[in-house]
Amino acid sequence: MTAISNHVGTIVKLNPDYTQMDAVYLTNKLLNLIGDAALDLPGDADPLTNLDLMVKAAQENGKIPDSQAARQILEAQLMDLATPTPSRINQLFWDKYQAGPRVATDWFFALSRANNYIQTRAIAKNVVFPAKTEYGDLEITINLSKPEKDPKDIAAAAHAAQSGYPACALCLQTEGYAGRTDFAARTNHRIIRFLLGGKTWGFQYSPYAYFNEHAIFLDAIHEPMVIDQSTFSNLLAIVSMFPTYFVGSNADLPIVGGSMLTHEHYQGGRHTFPMAKAPIETQVEISGHPHVFAGIVKWPMSVIRLVSADSDELINAAEHVRQVWNQYTDETVDVRAFVDGKPHHTVTPIARRVGSEFQLDLVLRDNQTSAEHPDGIFHPHQDVQHIKKENIGLIEVMGRAILPARLKSELAEVQKYLLGEANTMKPMHKTWADQLKAKYDWTPENVEAQMQAAVGRVFARVLEDAGVFKRDEVGQKAFARFCRAL
């Protein structure tokens, strides 16, 4: 079979807008993209390997330049043919939803993988391992999926005119956007529309997923993130609509928020995070909300879990906690709602369905900085920044570390150092490595497992740093004082 005929088969299989009668038409569409010389190009039975063959042929035929951006733009164009139009996708999704939410999401997820929008091969490169801690098994990932930028594309982007369209990577305007050297190709991207709080929102999957069925729910309007009562209402509405998914929001302040504060959005998916498995340590009473169970979660960060079958009462209770926290100051533990009139408090909320009940976890956040901790008082401190210095956002709050790609090679050098072998270990790891060398015996047989455990302990410390009420006696007494204010 040829690469062209194989891809025609993929298009007909995935896109109900085409049948085998369209084979000649589709062949000519493909030849226009990759060059007539590719007509008899031998194919591969695997659709993504077959895609690679066509892209390589297009480059050899002079249809695209030799750059990463050009290859990705063509990949998306070739897979766009295998993807139903946005209106058709939405019709099919909501038709399938009638048979059950899971039927619809399973179909949309499978399509988003098959059409290469979800970068399955890149995601498979990520390093993932569990780490036992006093808070349960944390999930450690070293994120290798996002490709390094091609120097040619960086140079081209520097000279390209800035259009400002699409406004950001989360905008509805990305749907079908061809892409350019400084903006990802999105021709094969599709977004499900739905109403949330009387406004149009979109639902899509993340192309570089950090966990199973990593979904993004985004406001149709490009407006900044905000945490208020409508946030809790929206999150509970989403888990009512998609009960097999959790959904949460990043905080709406710098340092404690995510990397995208300019566009209102939530993240969710079908994954049970370590925080969701963590037990309640202490029950808490929320004034005026007798039908809401509340408690402090056994977790390195400061989390109040609210549970109720009554979503309206749960929303009101969550808003009460948020408002009290937003005004709460305790100088004895460096917790300050305002400094010079500037607000520092917000929450990272996470919603899920558990049987007939709703759960809302509210993670208390404070984004102050100080001379001692210029990156953030409640942010990874200097001594753990050799492993993690970036913001602690929603996914990490829940117990899944997203560590930078540099660590794969850097930790390999640390392992050599621990084994007494020649190495090029970075100086920033030396203090930590010397502590590990003094405390444990290191052999070629145990070095990998012990290194993973050590990284897990550092991540637990990172989360403790981000916790506003520390796990020691002073911190827990301060947490109890806050809970009494509720």
UniProtKB/Swiss-Prot annotation:
One GO MF term attached to the UniProt entry: UDP-glucose:hexose-1-phosphate uridylyltransferase activity
Top-rank taxon, per record: Bacteria
UniProt xrefs under Pfam families: GalP_UDP_tr_C, GalP_UDP_transf
The enzyme's E.C. designation: 2.7.7.12
Cellular compartments annotated: Cytoplasm
Biological process (GO), any one: galactose metabolic process
Catalytic activity: alpha-D-galactose 1-phosphate + UDP-alpha-D-glucose = alpha-D-glucose 1-phosphate + UDP-alpha-D-galactose
Keyword annotations of the record: Carbohydrate metabolism, Cytoplasm, Galactose metabolism, Nucleotidyltransferase, Transferase
Enzyme type, top EC level: transferase
This protein's record includes keyword Cytoplasm: yes
UniProt pathway: Carbohydrate metabolism; galactose metabolism
Disulphide bridges: none
GO cellular component, one term: cytoplasm
InterPro entries: GalP_uridyl_Trfase_II (IPR000766), GalP_uridyl_Trfase_II_CS (IPR023425), GalP_Utransf_C (IPR005850), GalP_Utransf_N (IPR005849)
Annotated family: Belongs to the galactose-1-phosphate uridylyltransferase type 2 family.
Protein name (Swiss-Prot/TrEMBL): Galactose-1-phosphate uridylyltransferase
